């Protein structure tokens, strides 16, 4: 007893947690020391103890134990703030989509990680025995990441493609998820459940395939006598000691090992723990060990190459079925990998940088000499510290020291004030994540319809020379100019000369948007094109009047187009049939006392004037009323005044019939107050009663005037009128017309009445009969209007063209807008115009121009000497269709007859073509081409672009622009007037009241204008600008007649920006046409930030910007689509190729192993491998001479690829904490790399090209025949390797039975039944097992011996020589080089 006690006293007491691996070690030690029986007894006791303790503890888990981390709120807020800034940068085009995705992922990942690290300290302080806390690190159930999801935040999730969803789940499972978060996380969670089920079967199948490959490998000899080995080096700390010792224990040395001159281990000696420790301490030279790779036997393995048997701890027995053991050892942990797969449920974990946060508020100090400035990978400035850096933060009373590890980035400056928990440094992610990089393509889709432009040169990808895939050479912006495309399948007929006017019928097509004017009547369309236009010259104009076209003639106040070619010859260029009216500028108009109500020049929808059309009109404010009333024309006789009905609307053009030429000198307006009420409303006054001013009529209406009330009930509404005036009850004798009222001129009196009065003004007498018997007379006041020719419209236009001799006349006509006795209803607060003064256009018919049925009008804006003048241009032309008839061009006519110029009038009005040279101006991003569509025989799909309302913004005018008071007021009320109100389409001005205000383009200071014009190099601008004209169609869209790409701009699509008059003096940027402007760029001082877009019009004090969205793209990105192409929303715009770290979830587990074993290509070869091979091929042959260098190179390549395969597989298992001995994996890898493919170059007599043969067999055959056999080493997947074995029975029992057996029969293959499976199938004795060698007949052995020795000696001798020769050379040349540089991984196991 005493002895025992004393022994016990000497024992060391270990107080340590024991996990699985420690337990394994303990058991193996116990077996070594005490044997099996004793060990099992000890383990029993341990088990009993464990169960007792577990019963006593009884941990329970309740929902109250899930405590959210307090710092979560502000952390999430912080991250959201950063994301917001990022979003803004992306919007301005400073950051491209991939950067944005990456940064937002990093922001959220860092937040989530920081929360996870806070979790344990938080629990430790508040509740150390919290079951959730204990669960997170005990390893019994769950891990830190799962607990983090319960109490921290769920974080980023992967989507089904393995991509990151950049919307993080901010809640944890305790708080509960919102609907969106729930849907995002569903995928990962479900995948976890499904995967567990699917992967179990996967793992089983993997085991089956592995066993299939290696089932025939059995230990058959003691020593194959190989001299090769694989060197493993413990030096330089390349390999961790744990892995180093694992690799070595149980192996056999291939060479003696010397320590100086002393030999510490001999060849063929098994390595135990003692020897390994000695190697580690001595840091000896690289140790060469034998592995299954180096074994020389073809279809089995020798004891020494295999090493120790893991079960007994001594060399493996002969006859051991090591192949099957290897297959099962690799396959079995697969099930564990499966079960651990998706507990984290698709949560993203990647290696991003960790953050260091300041512990408190204070001033930060560090040694500036130890850091040097750099930028983070997101381009933010930072300091890089190369060694450990101590940072002190001085708060009020205490100093905090923070240690920042080397290779970290400091994000703050010295002496800067930091707030508590502010990020002050980033610690670089560990290197381990570098393996999980993969290349990903990210497509960027366009957010809106529009036209694509880019601001740099673009390469065509070589394979798509004629396609639309382009590579960007440098970082640049892609712009999508907003505007909806509208495809049309017509080929446009470009048979127009420069500056010709052209009817837009030929430019039409079926829109994607249903426009309310498309003609869908096919018969009418066929009728239109039935006559053959091109056969003979004919001037016939097809009659459109029978087309059921819907015409709405909106009136357009002055339509002007932005810029014509800047040739001032246009002033002098008066051709026949064309005349140009210069419009006066504002100053000239201000001198005359013309009221600013404005003259509207009305150009009809399609720009065509018939004879007697109204060209312009002027609404005289004197004839304007606010209230409702009735119009009466003078006396009953003067009825032949021109009324509105007599204007004939012909194809949308108002024109006068000349027969109504009579003039009226006066008309009368009888005011009355009218309220139109819904039928259900309750009225508080009776019919025929008399009310005073401001009487309550209905609940919310009061009368504005006093007088007689008349109530008329119609079907669905009530019309309530209040007539002001006097009421007379006349005697019987008064003869007042029963039906209508009578106008009484001044000076007449009621003769029969008792009191005889003179009437001073005109009055209107109306008889009212409230009941059958009685009636009374209402005498109502009348407003009299005289019509004079006082205001002459001619003052707007210079008198010159009115006396023009080229047969165009303008006449001035006044007409009354309302008919005699017509009641006029004014909507509240709008004024009613009673008389309109019109300018009527007419022209003479002379014999020559008999076909001039119509005139075209358009506005031209021309700058001369810095003044912008607007001209109205009117040309007398013939119909465009008769033009087409004049050109007897077969190809043109062919196109016409096929699908004609389909009359789907999307934009029924005339376009003016201005061609320029076909040269793309890269600087202005405005491609222009002379369009000869006639060369284009095949009908291509042309497209129109329709810009929609929301696409434009405008900069408000500045206060110093002389602006009309109306606009000023409206600006005060609402700074963003809808553009439609204040600015009609580009082309129409502001509404009539403030007609001139937007014409304030001629500055009062002529000098500045010229200065501006010099700056903005005008000549060039005029040649290049593409949008020559804007014309309107009836939807208020602006049509830009560009022959190849028709853009229909909506008024709102443009951003007007008004600049100061003296804007050149102030602004730093000179704005040029076509320039792209990003958002937030100020053009004028104190100008509001603009939307991003392209400048399409520069006036003297304003610019118009077409909205555009910038997308930043980096070099190497692929751009889809051509320059200037129309894109739809959702089209792919750019494809970025970028590397991302794979989500480090154990999605890798089994599939990764399978990927390696089945040799599926994973990703592109790493660059440094190629470089290594190149450098190897350069230097080695130089040292060894050519044949040897390449020979060794080839051998090393095979060895190296095998080693890297083993490392890859080990990595997956180790990452899961599964220990598998290398030799099991090596046996399998040996099988999949042992075949070679005979290549065709060296045709040999033995093998046919394309045959798969064992590597060793090929080498031996080559030596025996003394003839070179050319072959290539191939890597077979395990499935292919199973189907390429020596035995066809084994193959047939694996897959494709019928095919394999049929082929074998045809080829006459012989199965030598060497493996296990063949014998099992045929029911023979299995040729394995440790007692197997007794079965071999002794006499056979004797016979074989002499022969065998001869052979082996012969081969061995030769081979030894070669190999030793290699070896010595190799060692002498390379040992110095290879093992001092980290190219170590060439030879030796490396945990890469």
Curated annotation (Swiss-Prot):
<dbReference type="GO" id="GO:0005739">
    <property type="term" value="C:mitochondrion"/>
</dbReference>
<comment type="function">
    <text>DNA-dependent RNA polymerase catalyzes the transcription of DNA into RNA using the four ribonucleoside triphosphates as substrates.</text>
</comment>
<dbReference type="InterPro" id="IPR042102">
    <property type="entry name" value="RNA_pol_Rpb1_3_sf"/>
</dbReference>
<feature type="binding site">
    <location>
        <position position="302"/>
    </location>
    <ligand>
        <name>Zn(2+)</name>
    </ligand>
</feature>
<dbReference type="GO" id="GO:0000428">
    <property type="term" value="C:DNA-directed RNA polymerase complex"/>
</dbReference>
<keyword id="KW-0808">Transferase</keyword>
<feature type="binding site">
    <location>
        <position position="224"/>
    </location>
    <ligand>
        <name>Zn(2+)</name>
    </ligand>
</feature>
<keyword id="KW-0150">Chloroplast</keyword>
<comment type="subunit">
    <text>In plastids the minimal PEP RNA polymerase catalytic core is composed of four subunits: alpha, beta, beta', and beta''. When a (nuclear-encoded) sigma factor is associated with the core the holoenzyme is formed, which can initiate transcription.</text>
</comment>
<dbReference type="GO" id="GO:0003677">
    <property type="term" value="F:DNA binding"/>
</dbReference>
<dbReference type="GO" id="GO:0006351">
    <property type="term" value="P:DNA-templated transcription"/>
</dbReference>
<keyword id="KW-0240">DNA-directed RNA polymerase</keyword>
<dbReference type="GO" id="GO:0003899">
    <property type="term" value="F:DNA-directed RNA polymerase activity"/>
</dbReference>
<keyword id="KW-0479">Metal-binding</keyword>
<dbReference type="Pfam" id="PF05000">
    <property type="entry name" value="RNA_pol_Rpb1_4"/>
</dbReference>
<dbReference type="GO" id="GO:0009507">
    <property type="term" value="C:chloroplast"/>
</dbReference>
<feature type="binding site">
    <location>
        <position position="305"/>
    </location>
    <ligand>
        <name>Zn(2+)</name>
    </ligand>
</feature>
<comment type="similarity">
    <text>Belongs to the RNA polymerase beta' chain family. RpoC2 subfamily.</text>
</comment>
<keyword id="KW-0934">Plastid</keyword>
<dbReference type="Pfam" id="PF04998">
    <property type="entry name" value="RNA_pol_Rpb1_5"/>
</dbReference>
<protein>
    <recommendedName>
        <fullName>DNA-directed RNA polymerase subunit beta''</fullName>
        <ecNumber>2.7.7.6</ecNumber>
    </recommendedName>
</protein>
<dbReference type="GO" id="GO:0008270">
    <property type="term" value="F:zinc ion binding"/>
</dbReference>
<dbReference type="InterPro" id="IPR007081">
    <property type="entry name" value="RNA_pol_Rpb1_5"/>
</dbReference>
<dbReference type="InterPro" id="IPR007083">
    <property type="entry name" value="RNA_pol_Rpb1_4"/>
</dbReference>
<keyword id="KW-0804">Transcription</keyword>
<dbReference type="InterPro" id="IPR012756">
    <property type="entry name" value="DNA-dir_RpoC2_beta_pp"/>
</dbReference>
<dbReference type="InterPro" id="IPR038120">
    <property type="entry name" value="Rpb1_funnel_sf"/>
</dbReference>
<dbReference type="InterPro" id="IPR050254">
    <property type="entry name" value="RNA_pol_beta''_euk"/>
</dbReference>
<keyword id="KW-0548">Nucleotidyltransferase</keyword>
<feature type="binding site">
    <location>
        <position position="295"/>
    </location>
    <ligand>
        <name>Zn(2+)</name>
    </ligand>
</feature>
<keyword id="KW-0862">Zinc</keyword>
């Amino acid at each position: 007893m005493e002895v025992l006690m004393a022994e016990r006293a000497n024992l060391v007491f270990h107080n340590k947690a024991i996990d699985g691996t420690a337990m394994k070690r303990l058991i193996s030690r116990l077996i070594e020391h005490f044997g099996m029986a004793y060990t099992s007894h000890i383990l029993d006791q341990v088990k009993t103890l464990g169960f007792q303790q577990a019963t006593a503890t009884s941990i329970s888990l309740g929902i109250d134990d899930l405590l959210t981390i307090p710092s979560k709120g502000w952390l999430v807020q912080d991250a959201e703030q950063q994301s917001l800034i990022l979003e803004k940068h992306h919007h301005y085009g400073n950051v491209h989509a991939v950067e944005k995705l990456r940064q937002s992922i990093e922001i959220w990942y860092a937040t989530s990680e920081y929360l996870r690290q806070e979790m344990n300290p938080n629990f430790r302080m508040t509740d150390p025995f919290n079951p959730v806390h204990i669960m997170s690190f005990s390893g019994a159930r769950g891990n830190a990441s799962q607990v983090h999801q319960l109490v921290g935040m769920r974080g980023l999730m992967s989507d089904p493609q393995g991509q990151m969803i950049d919307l993080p789940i901010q809640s944890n499972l305790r708080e509960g998820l919102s609907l969106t978060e729930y849907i995002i996380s569903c995928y990962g969670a479900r995948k976890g459940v499904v995967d567990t089920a699917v992967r179990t079967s996967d793992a089983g199948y993997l085991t089956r395939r592995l066993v299939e490959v290696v089932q025939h490998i059995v230990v058959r000899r003691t020593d194959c006598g190989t001299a090769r080995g694989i060197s493993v080096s413990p030096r330089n700390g390349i390999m961790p000691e744990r892995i180093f010792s694992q690799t070595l224990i149980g192996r056999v040395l291939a060479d003696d090992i010397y320590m100086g001159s002393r030999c510490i281990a001999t060849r063929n000696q098994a390595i135990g723990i003692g020897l390994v420790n000695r190697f580690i301490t001595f840091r000896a030279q690289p140790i060469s060990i034998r592995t299954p790779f180096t074994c020389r036997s073809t279809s089995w393995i020798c004891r020494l190459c295999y090493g120790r048997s893991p079960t007994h701890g001594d060399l493996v027995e002969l006859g051991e079925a090591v192949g099957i053991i290897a297959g099962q050892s690799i396959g079995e942990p697969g099930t564990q990998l499966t079960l651990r797969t998706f507990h984290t449920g698709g949560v993203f974990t990647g290696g991003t940088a960790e953050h260091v946060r300041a512990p408190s508020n204070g001033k930060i100090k560090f040694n500036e000499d130890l850091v040097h400035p750099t930028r983070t990978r997101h381009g933010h400035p930072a300091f890089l510290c190369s060694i450990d850096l101590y940072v002190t933060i001085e708060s009020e009373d205490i100093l905090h020291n923070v240690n920042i590890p080397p290779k970290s980035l400091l994000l703050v400056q010295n002496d800067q004030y930091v707030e508590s928990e502010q990020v002050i440094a980033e610690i670089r992610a560990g290197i381990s994540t570098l393996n999980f990089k993969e290349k990903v393509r990210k497509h960027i889709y366009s957010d809106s319809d529009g036209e694509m432009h880019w601001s740099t040169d673009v390469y065509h990808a070589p394979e798509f020379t004629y396609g639309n895939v382009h590579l960007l050479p440098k970082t640049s912006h892609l712009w999508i100019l907003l505007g909806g495309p509208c495809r049309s399948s017509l080929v446009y007929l470009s048979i127009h000369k420069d500056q010709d006017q052209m009817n837009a019928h030929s430019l039409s097509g079926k829109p994607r948007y249903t426009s309310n004017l498309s003609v869908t009547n096919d018969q009418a369309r066929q009728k239109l094109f039935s006559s053959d236009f091109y056969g003979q010259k004919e001037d016939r104009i097809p009659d459109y009047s029978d087309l059921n076209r819907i015409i709405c003639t909106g009136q357009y106040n002055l339509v002007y187009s932005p810029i014509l070619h800047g040739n001032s010859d246009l002033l002098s260029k008066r051709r026949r049939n064309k005349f140009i009216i210069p419009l006066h500028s504002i100053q000239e108009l201000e001198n005359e006392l013309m009221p600013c109500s404005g003259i509207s020049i009305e150009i009809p929808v399609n720009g065509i004037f018939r004879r007697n059309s109204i060209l312009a009109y002027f609404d005289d404010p004197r004839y304007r009323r606010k209230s409702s009333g009735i119009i009466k024309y003078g006396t009953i006789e003067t009825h032949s005044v021109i009324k509105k009905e007599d204007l004939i609307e012909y194809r949308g053009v108002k024109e006068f019939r000349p027969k109504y030429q009579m003039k009226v000198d006066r008309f009368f307006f009888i005011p009355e107050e009218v309220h139109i009420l819904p039928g259900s409303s309750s009225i508080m006054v009776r019919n025929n009663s008399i009310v005073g001013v401001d009487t309550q009529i209905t609940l919310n209406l009061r009368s504005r005037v006093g007088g007689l009330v008349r109530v008329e009930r119609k079907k669905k509404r009530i019309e309530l009128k209040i007539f002001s005036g006097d009421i007379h009850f006349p005697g019987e004798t008064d003869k007042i017309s029963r039906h209508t009222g009578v106008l009484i001129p001044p000076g007449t009196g009621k003769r029969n009445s008792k009191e005889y009065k003179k009437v001073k003004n005109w009055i209107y007498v109306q008889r009212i009969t409230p009941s059958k018997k009685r009636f009374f007379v209402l005498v109502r006041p009348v407003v009299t209007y005289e019509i004079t020719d006082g205001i002459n419209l001619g003052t707007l236009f210079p008198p010159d063209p009115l006396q023009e001799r080229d047969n165009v006349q303008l006449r001035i006509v006044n007409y009354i807008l309302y008919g005699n006795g017509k009641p006029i209803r004014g909507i509240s607060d709008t004024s009613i115009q009673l008389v309109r003064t019109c300018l009527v256009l007419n022209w003479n018919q002379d014999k020559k121009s008999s076909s001039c049925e119509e005139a075209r009008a358009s506005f031209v804006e021309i700058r001369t000497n810095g003044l912008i003048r607007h001209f109205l241009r009117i040309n007398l032309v013939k119909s465009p269709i008769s033009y087409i008839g004049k050109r007897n061009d077969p190809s043109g006519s062919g196109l016409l007859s096929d699908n004609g110029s389909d009359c789907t009038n999307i934009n029924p009005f005339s376009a003016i073509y201005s061609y320029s040279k076909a040269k793309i101006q890269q600087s202005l991003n405005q491609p222009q081409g002379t369009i000869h569509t006639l060369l284009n025989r095949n009908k291509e799909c042309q497209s129109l672009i329709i810009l929609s309302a929301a696409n434009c913004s405008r900069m408000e005018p500045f206060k110093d622009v002389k602006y009309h008071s109306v606009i000023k007021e409206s600006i005060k009320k609402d700074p963003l007037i809808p553009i439609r109100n204040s600015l009609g389409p580009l082309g129409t001005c502001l509404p009539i009241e403030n007609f001139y205000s937007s014409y304030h383009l001629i500055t009062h200071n002529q000098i500045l204008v010229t200065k501006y014009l010099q700056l903005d190099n005008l000549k060039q601008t005029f040649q290049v600008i593409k949008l020559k004209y804007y014309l309107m169609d009836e939807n208020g869209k602006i049509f830009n007649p560009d022959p190849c790409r028709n853009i229909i701009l909506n008024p709102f699509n443009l951003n007007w920006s008004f600049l100061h008059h003296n804007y050149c003096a102030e602004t730093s940027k000179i704005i040029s046409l076509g320039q792209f402007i990003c958002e937030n760029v100020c053009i004028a001082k104190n100008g509001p930030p603009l939307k991003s877009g392209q400048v399409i019009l520069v006036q003297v004090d304003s610019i118009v910007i077409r909205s555009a969205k910038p997308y930043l793209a980096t070099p190497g990105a692929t751009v889809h689509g051509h320059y200037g192409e129309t894109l739809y929303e959702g089209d792919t715009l750019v494809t970025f190729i970028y590397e991302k770290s794979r989500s480090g979830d154990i999605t890798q587990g089994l599939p990764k192993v399978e990927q390696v074993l089945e040799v599926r290509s994973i990703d592109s070869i790493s660059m440094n491998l190629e470089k290594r091979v190149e450098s190897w091929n350069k230097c080695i042959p130089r040292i060894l001479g050519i044949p040897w260098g390449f020979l060794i190179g080839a051998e090393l390549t095979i060895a190296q690829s095998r080693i890297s395969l083993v490392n890859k597989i080990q990595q997956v298992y180790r990452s899961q904490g599964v220990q598998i001995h290398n030799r099991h994996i090596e046996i399998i890898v040996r099988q999949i790399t042992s075949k070679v493919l005979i290549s065709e170059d060296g045709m040999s007599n033995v093998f046919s090209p394309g045959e798969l043969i064992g590597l060793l067999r090929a080498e031996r055959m080559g030596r025996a025949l003394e003839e070179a056999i050319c072959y290539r080493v191939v890597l077979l997947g395990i499935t292919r390797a199973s189907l390429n074995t020596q035995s066809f029975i084994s193959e047939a029992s694996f897959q494709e039975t019928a095919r394999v057996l049929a082929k074998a029969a045809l080829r006459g293959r012989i199965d030598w039944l060497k493996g296990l499976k063949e014998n099992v199938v045929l029911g023979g004795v299995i040729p394995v097992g440790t007692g197997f060698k007794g079965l071999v007949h002794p006499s056979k052995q004797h016979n074989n011996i002499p022969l065998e020795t001869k052979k082996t000696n012969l081969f061995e001798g030769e081979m030894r020589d070669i190999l030793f020769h290699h070896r010595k050379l190799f060692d002498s040349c390379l040992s110095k080089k290879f093992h001092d540089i980290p190219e170590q991984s060439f030879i030796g196991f490396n945990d890469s």
